[in-house]
Amino acid sequence: MALVEVRNLTKVYPLGQNVFGRGGHGEVRAVDDVSLQIEAGETLGLVGESGSGKSTIGRLVLRLIEPSSGSVSFEGKDLVLLGHGELRRLRRDMQIIFQDPFGSLDPRFRVEDIVAEPLVIHEPGSRVARRERVRELLRAVGMDESALPRYPHEFSGGQRQRIGIARALALRPKFIVADEPVSALDVSVGAQIVNLLAQLQRELGLTYLFISHSMPVVRYLATRIAVMYRGKLVEVGPAEQITTRPQNSYTQSLLAATPEMTV
């Protein structure tokens, strides 16, 4: 049984009205009848251009937004059918790393509080135990305890993304959606973050849905690759096959348009 299974997933948004109350007819199918599976321990790379629906899929898989139709199963449980309490318990096992490492961190909070927030919510315990867990998490992402009393604006973009990764790891999740986690970083820093994610996967047995517009980034990290175009899944297969023998013309154009990534 796959860890994550998506069946016939669709997300439809109505077209908005203008200031005169006109328009609003029709709809946009951000995700259109998508089915895919993610096996435990693998990285499924979800790649496509801006507006392809890939980030919407990431949010649907975590049920951060509701689907228009279709199902999302995690360890055999249909998330769409779960009540708030059951879903809250499953949140421990499913986390997200956001694209913007600054916007995703509350600027009013110190690093210690940011990383500890999931522990406060899901694992009430002593402050001493939480602080030790936060130290452990920071070490895991290549930072030290000198970061604890500092605020997000005091760090570089790469360091902020490491803090976001530490927070995502706090509850020892099985599955992480990494939504364009290096697109806001320069190439060298982004490569360091990709290497960190690969290392954490090896050490912790994580499963990733890695979302990116960059085929070279996805090619480096992914076990399998799924290609999105205008809300539809146009090609899925092993990473080596997709990157060397693509069948779909859009996949071919993505490969031709992007340079190699040095990691």
Give the role of each language-model region.
Residues G70-D78:
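Conserved ABC transporter NBD signature motif
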Residues K77-D78, V128-S146, L255-A256:
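Conserved ABC ATPase "signature" region
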Residues F20-H25, L79-Q95, D113, I121, ...:
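ABC ATPase NBD coupling module
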Residues L62:
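Helix-to-loop junction immediately C-terminal to a conserved catalytic motif
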Residues Y151-F155, Q159:
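Conserved ABC ATPase signature
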Residues A170-K174:
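A short, proline-enriched helix->beta-strand linker immediately N-terminal to the Walker B motif
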